């Protein structure tokens, strides 16, 4: 499985900039930020596995409107169905669709994952193509997939 650390790289660069922008925009936030200089709002991401593009999107879809704890539980169940690893797009497509429901995905999220998997398998989506796109192009491309909206696409 290839590795795509792109989302984490962006977060590492964006956090200091975002923190400084918030400090300048709001004196109350400035005091809170100054009182906690080591606070990293996205530190929870450090515990997440680094996945390829498809795996990252599976995680993103799983987390739509759910807590981090619920998302992790669903992903853990999914990985158990696939021998302890995140399935590739081809593995997910080859599996019984009920595996997604048994893992905790809603029917709609299952349809979204299968549509994503089809695009990765047939080449309409790839890690390389997504990495070469601008953020706006990534968002436009991913939101063509039913069930992927701007929130999920921007999180990628």
Summary of predicted features, one role per range:
Residues 62, 134-156:
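Catalytic DNA-binding helix-loop module of base-excision-repair DNA glycosylases/AP lyases
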Residues 1-133, 137:
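N-terminal polyanion-binding entry modules of DNA glycosylases/AP lyases
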């Amino acid at each position: 499985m290839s590795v795509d650390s792109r989302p984490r790289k962006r977060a590492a660069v964006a956090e200091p900039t975002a923190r400084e922008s918030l400090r300048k925009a709001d004196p109350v936030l400035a005091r809170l930020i100054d009182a906690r200089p080591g606070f990293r709002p996205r530190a929870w991401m450090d515990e997440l596995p680094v996945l390829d593009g498809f795996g990252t999107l599976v995680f993103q879809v799983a987390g739509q409107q759910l807590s981090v704890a619920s998302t992790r539980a669903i992903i853990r169940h999914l990985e158990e169905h696939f021998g302890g690893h995140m399935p590739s797009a081809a593995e997910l497509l080859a599996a019984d669709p009920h595996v997604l429901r048994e893992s905790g995905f809603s029917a709609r999220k299952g349809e979204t994952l299968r549509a994503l998997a089809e695009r990765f398998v047939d080449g309409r989506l790839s890690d390389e193509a997504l990495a070469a796109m601008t953020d706006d192009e990534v968002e436009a491309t991913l939101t063509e997939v039913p069930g992927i909206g701007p929130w999920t696409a921007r999180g990628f």
